């Protein structure tokens, strides 16, 4: 087995010693904070749980009083000027939960002030009015309901709204996504039999507040553990509110939370208590993976926290959760990793038996969707096993799951347990660096083929590059302390990987600037990144991340050797040659050298994937065309523009568009070199195109049956049947693409129309070229059937692949971003996106022609400059330079209209979405602009050099 990835030595011994002392202090303080009965918890106070605890009444000696008046006063202190209880930029749902629960608590106190007499009814009325107004405002613009991963939100918010409607004596709250919420509620409830809650433990016990009046709480007392319902103060509060028999143990638990939680008696209640196992494992693993050695931080604190984990795994039969009796794969895997790092390994076999699913590990029993970070924690724990080969199937499964997740993630990768994309990104870099290290050493080389290794390398490279590209000028990532730590830890890990050799100075500069910002950052600035019912910070864990980031960043830079077995990371000579052209374009000439090189390296990971599909549709070896050198540059055109604009479209979208670009070139060549000559009679070829498209649309099963490799035709002269078979494969690959079939019917119809037009335009172009080639002179097209304007807006423009590719992209957005809804729903949006497509297509044709004049003249192909409008002006013949100048002016005109159409589309999309304009509305526009950037890049490259293969 290869040696472990070694950290360097501290650059500054004094600084290193300071960090070691601080780490040992953290471990000691965390261990001493552990209560033998109630456990350990440093999670921040949450309004939501505070509100529920504020609603607990208790009757003593026939006198009813509020049990925790401090919580009520905490709510008064934390209400914002706008009536809400705060908001987070990363989640609307948390703000709605906080505001709704706090308003409900105020309503309860307004109706029964009981012993609290220092707040006037007028003030209470005003606070409630402002709170309700804020809640309605938040509900009106709520657009992340389907994306939210807050625990139990499908149960809790409907219950809260129902309670508020009853207390306020108002009809139902109406808001745009109410039907979506109700559907989610019904689907989630369908997974549970409420009667079973009285027997075995269930995740519903964590959210009992959603079931007040629906369950007999007196039958739930046996589920209490050390006074809590699944370590949830809000659920425990609901139990005390709903049960007819008072439970002193539950009251004692809440009093302990009040006194010893992050609020320290000020009325604030932690959202989860305790978080013993979570904090023990995260603190240990974070420090030891973050540059501290076991020898440096060994002591009572480290040994004490390790013992807590060992005893928990023993007492709970090999699987644990964030607290006792809350088993999940996340905390189990992290505990196994932590114990491996302190040389006290525990077998992962029980974890695998309990949580392994068909294609991923589940976090716990019933969950709406899987967790990326849970699977990464499993992978990291398995990679530390001494008998690695025993766990090859699980390592393969979690690696494949992670690759697929990253491949399909648009913009930022998301996870259900942390609001920051940087957390799963950090874990991915950490895990995949270790995977590559083991591949290099031979331990995992048999598990992964070249394509898989390509995707592992690509995932690491993109993760690190995007962290670098999104660092703020002050050295932080959006001014958040813990998220900046995640970024630094990922970058430090990347210093071991050879892919980053060409940009190591930039990488180190990012680490240094992050280090400086972090050292000056106050410990009092909260970063609420962890999710439960709302969002919270874990004090000790945040401190561990800060120390790990500072320590790892201060170590000497090691030699970057990991990843040498992934040969795709080395750009081809063809790609490097084309980069000299790219540097001359207006889009990329302002870019720093390192940034351009980074996109070149990222592109190189896609090239082998594209090469593997090179002859899937079209045979090439027996076709009289030059070598397809464009294959090397296609990935860069998409990757470079993606990074330049910081769009970060999914690899799924990027690769599909790359492949479509490849097919566009190949179709052009095939129609000219094979289909046209084989058919001879172009009218028959027109009929064949219609038949192929109609059959593909009408008989998916038949179309699927024709999909096979083009290799079968490459050593024989093609006949009409073989051409039809090839065109059927191509048509099927576009119109019956999985995501196209999952897109809206309107977007599919548009693609079908544009594709049919594209195919027929090729045949018409063949006819035009045939007539042109028979002319005595190749200087001017003497028999055009249309004016230049008509031609470029029909045959000429449609002949390039731009329009149908645009429609294809819209189908991908419909399927993957918009759950099968129209990419552009209103009539105005549809018109404007069509205008964008038309102007982009016309530009593409014009610039393509500008760059291919010499080739078209040699091959006698019709070019824009051959039309009479260019050859003559006021009866005077125009020379080549004059024609090119006029063509560029018209192309510039089209560019202006394209820009205006894009602006109008953006305005209209915002107007149609109104206040509920969310991330998906903005994402589709970003992707449209990215597509236009790629088109623009091709246009600029065509001006510099013709990219198409020449006919032999």
Curated annotation (Swiss-Prot):
A motif (DEXXE A-type cyclization motif) lies at residues 668-672. Induction: Expression is induced under gibberellin-producing conditions. Pathway: Plant hormone biosynthesis; gibberellin biosynthesis. One of its GO terms (biological process) is gibberellin biosynthetic process. Mg(2+) 3 binds at residues 848-849, 852, 856. One of its GO terms (molecular function) is ent-copalyl diphosphate synthase activity. A motif (DXDD B-type cyclization motif) lies at residues 328-331. Mg(2+) 2 binds at residues 668, 672. Its cofactor is Mg(2+). Mg(2+) 1 binds at residues 668, 672. Belongs to the terpene synthase family. Bifunctional ent-kaurene synthase; part of the gene cluster that mediates the biosynthesis of gibberellins (GAs), diterpenoids that may provide a selective advantage during infection of the preferred host plant, rice. Gibberellins (GAs) are diterpenoids and are synthesized via the mevalonate pathway. Biosynthesis of the major metabolite GA3 (gibberellic acid) from geranylgeranyl diphosphate (GGPP) requires 13 steps. The Asp-Asp-Xaa-Xaa-Asp/Glu (DDXXD/E) motif is important for the catalytic activity, presumably through binding to Mg(2+). This is Bifunctional ent-kaurene synthase. It comes from Gibberella fujikuroi (strain CBS 195.34 / IMI 58289 / NRRL A-6831) (Bakanae and foot rot disease fungus). The gene is CPS/KS.
């Amino acid at each position: 087995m290869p040696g472990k990835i070694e950290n360097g030595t501290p650059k500054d011994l004094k600084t290193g010693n300071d960090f070691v002392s601080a780490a040992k202090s953290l471990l000691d303080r965390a261990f001493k904070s552990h209560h033998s009965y109630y456990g350990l918890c440093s999670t921040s106070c949450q309004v939501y749980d505070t509100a529920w605890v504020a609603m607990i009444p208790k009757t003593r000696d026939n006198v009813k009083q509020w049990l925790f008046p401090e919580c009520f006063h905490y709510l008064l202190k934390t209400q914002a000027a706008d009536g809400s209880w705060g908001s987070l930029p990363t989640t609307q749902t948390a703000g709605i939960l906080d505001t709704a629960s706090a308003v409900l608590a105020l309503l309860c106190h307004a109706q029964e002030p009981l012993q609290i007499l220092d707040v006037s009814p007028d003030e209470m009325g005003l606070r409630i009015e402002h709170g309700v107004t804020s809640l309605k405002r938040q509900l009106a613009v709520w657009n992340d309901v389907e994306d939210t991963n807050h625990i139990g939100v499908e149960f809790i918010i409907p219950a809260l709204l129902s309670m508020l409607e009853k207390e306020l004596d108002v009809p139902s709250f109406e808001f745009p996504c109410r039907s979506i919420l109700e559907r989610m509620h019904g689907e989630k409830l369908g997974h549970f039999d409420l009667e079973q809650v009285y027997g075995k433990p269930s995740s519903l016990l964590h959210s009992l507040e959603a079931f007040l009046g629906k369950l007999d709480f007196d039958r739930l007392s046996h589920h209490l553990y050390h006074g809590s319902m699944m370590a949830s103060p809000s659920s425990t509060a609901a139990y005390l509110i709903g049960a007819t028999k008072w439970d002193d143990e539950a009251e004692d638990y809440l009093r302990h939370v009040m006194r010893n939680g992050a609020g320290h008696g000020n009325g604030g209640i932690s959202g989860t208590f305790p978080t013993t196992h979570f904090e023990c494992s995260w603190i240990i693993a974070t420090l030891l993976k973050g540059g501290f050695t076991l020898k440096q931080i060994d002591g009572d604190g480290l040994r004490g926290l390790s013992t807590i984990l060992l005893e928990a795994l023993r007492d709970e039969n090999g699987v644990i959760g964030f607290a006792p009796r809350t088993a999940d794969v996340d905390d189990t895997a992290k505990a196994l990793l932590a114990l491996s790092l302190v040389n006290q390994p525990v077998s992962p076999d029980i974890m695998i038996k309990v949580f392994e699913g068909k294609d991923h590990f589940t976090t716990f029993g019933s969950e709406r969707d899987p967790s990326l970070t849970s699977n990464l924690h499993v992978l990291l724990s398995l990679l530390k096993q001494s008998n690695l080969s025993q766990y090859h199937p699980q390592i393969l499964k979690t690696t494949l799951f992670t690759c697929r997740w990253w491949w399909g993630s648009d913009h930022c990768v998301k996870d259900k347990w942390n609001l920051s994309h940087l957390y799963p990104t950090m874990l991915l870099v950490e895990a995949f660096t270790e995977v590559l290290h083991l591949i290099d050493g031979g331990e995992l080389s048999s598990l992964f083929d070249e394509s898989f290794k390509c995707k592992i390398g690509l995932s690491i490279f993109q993760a690190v590059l995007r962290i670098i590209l999104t660092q703020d000028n002050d050295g932080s990532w959006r001014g958040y302390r813990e998220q900046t730590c995640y970024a630094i830890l990922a970058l430090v890990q990347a210093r071991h990987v050879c892919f980053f050799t060409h940009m190591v100075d930039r990488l180190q500069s990012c680490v240094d600037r992050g280090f400086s910002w972090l050292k000056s950052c106050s410990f009092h600035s909260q970063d609420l990144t962890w999710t439960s019912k709302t969002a919270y910070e874990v004090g000790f864990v945040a401190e561990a991340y800060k120390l790990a980031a500072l320590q790892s960043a201060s170590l000497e830079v090691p030699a970057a050797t990991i990843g040498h077995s992934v040969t795709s990371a080395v750009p081809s000579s063809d790609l490097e040659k084309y980069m000299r052209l790219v540097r001359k374009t207006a889009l990329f000439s302002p870019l720093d050298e390192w940034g351009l090189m980074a996109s070149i390296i990222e592109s190189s990971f896609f090239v082998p994937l594209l090469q593997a599909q090179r002859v899937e549709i079209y045979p090439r070896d027996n076709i009289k065309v030059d070598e397809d050198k464009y294959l090397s540059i296609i990935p860069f055109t998409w990757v470079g523009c993606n990074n330049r604009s910081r769009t970060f479209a999914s690899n799924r979208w990027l690769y599909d568009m790359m492949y479509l670009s490849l097919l566009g070139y190949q179709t052009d060549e095939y129609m000219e070199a094979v289909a046209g000559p084989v058919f001879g009679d172009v009218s028959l070829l027109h009929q064949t195109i219609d038949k192929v498209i109609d059959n593909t649309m009408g008989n998916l099963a038949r179309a699927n049956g024709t999909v096979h490799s083009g290799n079968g035709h490459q050593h024989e002269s093609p006949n009409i049947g073989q051409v039809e078979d090839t065109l059927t494969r191509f048509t099927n690959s576009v119109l019956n693409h999985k995501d196209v079939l999952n897109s809206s019917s309107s977007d599919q119809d548009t693609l079908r129309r544009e594709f049919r037009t594209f195919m027929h335009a090729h045949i018409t172009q063949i006819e035009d070229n045939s007539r042109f080639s028979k002319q005595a002179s190749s200087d001017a097209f003497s028999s055009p059937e249309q004016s230049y304007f008509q031609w470029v807006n029909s045959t000429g423009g449609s002949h390039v692949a731009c329009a149908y590719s645009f429609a294809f992209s819209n189908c991908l957005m419909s399927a993957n971003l918009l759950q099968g809804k129209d990419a552009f729903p209103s009539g105005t949006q549809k018109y404007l996106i069509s205008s964008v497509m038309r102007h982009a297509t016309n530009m593409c044709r014009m610039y393509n022609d500008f760059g291919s004049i010499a080739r078209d003249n040699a091959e006698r192909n019709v070019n824009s400059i051959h039309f009479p409008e260019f050859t003559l002006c006021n009866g005077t013949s125009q020379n080549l330079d004059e024609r090119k100048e006029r063509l560029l002016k018209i192309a510039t005109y089209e560019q202006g209209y394209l820009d205006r159409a894009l602006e109008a589309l953006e305005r209209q999309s915002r107007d149609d979405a109104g206040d509920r304009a969310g991330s998906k509305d903005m994402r589709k526009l970003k992707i449209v602009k990215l597509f236009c950037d790629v088109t623009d890049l091709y246009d600029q490259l065509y001006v510099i050099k013709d990219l198409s293969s020449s006919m032999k």
